Amino acid sequence: MAHIGKRISKAREGIDRVKLYPIRDAIALIKERASAKFDETVEIAMNLGVDPKHADQMVRGVVNLPNGTGRTLRVAVFARGAKADEATAAGADIVGAEDLVATVQGGTIAFDRCIATPDMMPLVGRLGKVLGPRGLMPNPKVGTVTMDVAAAVKASKGGAVEFRVEKAGIIQGSVGKASFDDDKLAENIAAFVDAVAKAKPQGAKGTYIQRVAISSTMGPGVKVDPATLTA
């Protein structure tokens, strides 16, 4: 534990925890500190001026990152017949109906994204207590309940990232890898922030985007000046 504490303290050196850094400077700082033996994920955290306890202040959506996430997602699709065939052809990793429901109910969740055709939702609804807490429940608002399963699968494989505000008014997401070049990371971060901005609920009062910070998996957070972000 002491070793971890020293590493974190060292990584924080040279970072002003109050300053809002231009996006390029922030990216440089986190990449310099991404010293793990694996390709660290670059993550974003946004503090929003909303209270998700109120239905009219819920923030949820999906963003297609222009440069992908750097991660290969396993996609499951609940569909039958021709739609199941379309999903398979589009690259879905797991396709099924009652059999897939039984697999999930049995405790096996071997996927990172879940898509369903509308007619499958009464069946998929039985999995709410399992998929919901994991953020895997299909939802038409983010394009995962759809008849166009091929497009949904390709979007998921190509860099679509869902976001949803948490209890404290925070949204978090992955925007790439530390190995990405600066331009690609900057474009992904700007796209994520822009999508959250466009998802502003009618019930939001005052300053909507209050804070933006980025970090690598094992590194400290760096606050970003939102004015330097352009999608």
From Swiss-Prot:
Belongs to the universal ribosomal protein uL1 family. Binds directly to 23S rRNA. The L1 stalk is quite mobile in the ribosome, and is involved in E site tRNA release. One of its GO terms (biological process) is translation. Signal peptide: none annotated. GO terms for molecular function: rRNA binding; structural constituent of ribosome; tRNA binding. Keywords: Repressor, Ribonucleoprotein, Ribosomal protein, RNA-binding, rRNA-binding, Translation regulation, tRNA-binding. It holds the Pfam family Ribosomal_L1. GO terms for cellular component: cytosolic large ribosomal subunit. Part of the 50S ribosomal subunit. This is Large ribosomal subunit protein uL1. The keyword rRNA-binding applies. NCBIfam families: rplA_bact. It comes from Methylocella silvestris (strain DSM 15510 / CIP 108128 / LMG 27833 / NCIMB 13906 / BL2). InterPro entries: Ribosom_uL1_bac-type (IPR005878), Ribosomal_uL1 (IPR002143), Ribosomal_uL1-like (IPR023674), Ribosomal_uL1/biogenesis (IPR028364), Ribosomal_uL1_3-a/b-sand (IPR016095), Ribosomal_uL1_CS (IPR023673).
